[in-house]
Amino acid sequence: MKKINIIAILLFLSTAVNCFASGAYYLPDVTGEMSAASYWTKESEVLMSYEEIEKLNEEIISAKGTNMYDLKNQPEVIDGIALNEAIKKSSQADAGYYLGWTYFESAEKATQEDFDKLIENTQNPDAKKEQKVLYGIATKRTELRTFPSPVAIWDDPADSDLDYQYLVGVRVNEPVVITSKSKDGKYYLAKNICCSGWIPADAVAICSDKEEWISVWDIKHDDALVVWGDKVFLESSVVGKETSDLMLTMGTVLELAKDVNPDELVDNRAAYNNFVVWVPVRNDDGTYSKKKALISEHKKVHKGYMMLTKENISKVAFSALGNTYGWGGGLYSDDCSGYMRNVYKCFDMELARNTTWQSSMPMAKVDMQYMAKEEKIKFFDALPFGTILYFNGHEMMYLGAENGKYYVISAVGTIMQPENPTVRQRIRSTIINTLDVKRANGNTWFDEITLALVPYFGINENALPEYDWYHGGVAYCLKNKIMQGDENKFFNPTKNITWAEVLQMLYNMEEVKPEYALEDDAPWYARAVRWAEENMLICENDKGFNPNSQITREQLASLFYLYAKFKGYDVSVGEETNILSYDDAFDISEYAIPAMQYIIGAGIIKGKTISTVNPKDSTTRAEIAVIIERFIGCKSN
């Protein structure tokens, strides 16, 4: 009996994860072979030139909603007094957000007094009415923080790896514009290209002026060494203690030293089989200097920015596979949006900080929030590798489809357990999974995807697959809860629609819906039919009316004509419409002629072809969705 139980348990577990001889574990439908970057793509076509990427960066920085900073053009003098006041107000707002559900490195919830101490430290005691900004360079992997304090802010005392202080990771040699300092002098208020927050002062070197600052990080392509691996460490050295074991994370860009004599010792070593780079150093007085360091040619680094190809995107993304997830850049790692930023930084592309801000970037994108399921499937089948997919609070890189499954790679905090989707499972790693994984609301990731964005195509390029003519109408009707999919969330666009369904849609469009007392066994459409009958929306000439019968195009025209008059809309628009221009005009029933004139004249229904209206044909769900959207547009105009 015990043996049977053990076997049953093993069989149960095998449905939850895959385990291979290597000892690595995978989520369902993920195999060991899929962990290789080359499994997904080997395409080496250059997707964008360096010049195109530079132009795109300018557009991203200037686009409304991306919250990016043009660092070179920030004000050089600010009002420090006013800034102190603004910082205090914003910090009070932040404290109000966190108060009541967070902890300060203890089992006791943080109090208002705890936050007041942090807020007090935001005030620069040396603030001036006219205050020059400072120009800093990060000398070690660090972060921007919510408050100027090392104290961690947790939402769970048992989960000290997730610290809400972290806003974004800052790479070695990354520039920041400094606008203020904390009361204790241990933090600077700073901006990097995508965020603002408090940076530890001991992680920043202050340049002598703006010109020196720009020269440190504005590196020409041929003079740059780019770290494309998740983490690269400089070698240990007693002689070179300033750079010994220095961590360089994905997307770090350093300047290559020129005119190097390989016999010249760098930290007690010759330069053979190494790159020689300049590394920023913070002097004892906090000022900037630089020193040479060696990086092995076998490290995951690249001379110049990498060429933007699908093969290289995959290579970079997979260098972080299995590594730690770090909220806001914590744990010297990154979260989902930070991970995507780091990947594309290796190609000199600057993405916005978070999922919301990235959605405003001027790139090829498609809003899938209200896309019907079958259309979504068709759309996914044509998605290019490297597309960034979004739903509320998460983003991921699309890899491809296999055996009807869609695969993504992302830095993941939690998912619902595949074998028990009511239980939340902490992941905290960069992983591969299918879009069959579920969220806490019971929907799959596939169901929840709201946006697809291709970073390597401009906004005017046809980078994403085209979607069907009825997408706008379907999206409108789903969004406004006029229509819905079936129990499996399929929209069924080609299915013919019935009288009952159309009447229910019109009923759904009413802002104030009359309630009727109905029998327990009344059909689902009973209220809508009764409402339509009371308001004389069913034409008396439709003697064959049956709620479950399919509605013809001329019946639909008559229904919308009567509904427009019921709502008080102007129906005179169709009085001059010459429907005799259609070859099958005499097939239109006499009672429906005014309605067909109105609905065709208003552009709500169009001919099946240039010369026919097919009045006796049935109407599909896709057609009615578009008709409703056009009808609402007519009403608005």
Model-identified regions with their sequence ranges:
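Bacterial N-terminal signal peptides
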Residues: 8-18
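Aromatic- and glycine-rich peptidoglycan recognition patches
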Residues: 22-38, 194, 202-226, 230-234, ...
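...with weaker cross-activation on analogous glycine-rich loops/strands in unrelated enzymes
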Residues: 169, 351-419
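Loop/turn positions that initiate beta-strands
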Residues: 173, 222, 249-254, 385-386
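Glycine-rich catalytic cores of cysteine/serine-nucleophile enzymes that process amide/ester linkages
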Residues: 231, 236-293, 323-334, 390-438
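Active-site nucleophilic cysteine motif
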Residues: 317, 327-358, 499, 503, ...
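Feature responds to low-complexity, polar/acidic, surface-exposed segments characteristic
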Residues: 460-471, 479-554, 562-592, 606-618, ...
